[in-house]
Regions:
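Helix-turn-helix DNA-binding motif, specifically the short coil turn and the N-cap/start of the second
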Residues: 37, 46-51
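The N-cap/first-turn positions of alpha helices
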Residues: 23-24
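A short pre-motif secondary-structure segment
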Residues: 27-31
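Acidic, proline/glycine-rich intrinsically disordered inter-domain spacer in sigma factors
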Residues: 1-18
C-alpha cells in the first residue's frame, strides 16, 4: 500500500471516531490505541468495567458500520 493510501485510511478512521459518542470514543482510544486495560479505563472514566466493555463493543460496531458505509472494506 502506498503512503497516500495509508494517509487515507488514517483519515477514514479519524472521521469514524468522530462519529462516536464521546464516552465510546474515549474507551476505544484508550483501549485500542493506548493499550489501557478495561479496569484502568473504568477508573479513569468513573464508569463500571462492564459498561466500558459495552462501550467498546458498541463503538467497534459503529466504527465498522461507518467505515463500510464509506467504502472501506479492510483491503485498502
Amino acid at each position: 500500500s502506498t503512503e497516500q493510501e495509508n494517509v487515507g485510511q488514517k483519515m477514514d478512521v479519524y472521521q469514524s471516531l468522530k462519529s462516536l459518542k464521546e464516552v465510546e470514543r474515549t474507551c476505544i482510544t484508550l483501549f485500542y490505541m493506548e493499550d489501557v486495560s478495561i479496569d484502568k479505563i473504568a477508573g479513569i472514566t468513573g464508569i463500571p468495567a462492564g459498561t466500558v466493555k459495552s462501550h467498546l463493543s458498541r463503538g467497534k460496531e459503529k466504527l465498522a458500520t461507518y467505515l463500510k458505509r464509506n467504502g472501506y472494506d479492510g483491503n485498502r
